[in-house]
Amino acid sequence: KTTIRRDSKVRQLSKGMVAQLHLALVMAIDARLLVLDEPTLGLDILYRKQFYDSLLNDYYDRSRTIIVTTHQVEEIQNVLTDVMFIDRGRIVFNCSMEDFESRYVEVMVNPEQAAAARALKPMHERPALGRSILLFDLASEHGANSKFDRQQLSALGEVHTPSIADLFVAVMSNQRTTTGAAR
């Protein structure tokens, strides 16, 4: 769905309209595997949302696979079946969304609970309005087989599933710290 007229010249279109045209052409292809690299780059939020809605409702069916690379993970998080992070050509993270939702937990703690939360060895920590948000991997060596779980973490503060963007920051920060130390 677009507002581009049939008699429009490509050279007269805005960058966003050229992107809309390109995406319409891509979606017209009947392919079992569709690879989209930053498909909504240059589109405003309204057209990005419409594109993903069309992609899922008009294009996708169970016989097709769609691979999307994007820096705007938050706009597609709710439609993903799997997530993968790549750093310098190497896969550094790969899991299903089902595993993601059961495995990763963020806890927002007050300063009084911060030391107890840190003792559980989170994979990442960031400050937030005078409190700390700690991200845990419940399947890590300190997680699934350890002495804490999601319910026990809730005694330390507010517990929720992290966004993919927050997990990305944690994984990449740890990756860069590890590879930087190895050099």
What are these regions (language model features)?
Residues Y52-E141:
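ABC transporter nucleotide-binding domain
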Residues L129-R183:
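C-terminal coupling/interaction segments
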Residues L34-P39, A114-A117, E141-S146:
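Short, surface-exposed beta-strand/loop "edge" segments at domain boundaries and coil↔beta transitions
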Residues V26, E112, S173:
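Residue-level marker of positions within ordered structural domains that often coincide
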Residues H22, R32, V105, S173-T177:
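Generic structural signal for secondary-structure transition and capping sites
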Residues I4, I91, V105, A155-E158:
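Short N-terminal micro-motifs specific to bacterial/archaeal maturation
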Residues K1-D87, F93:
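ABC transporter nucleotide-binding domains
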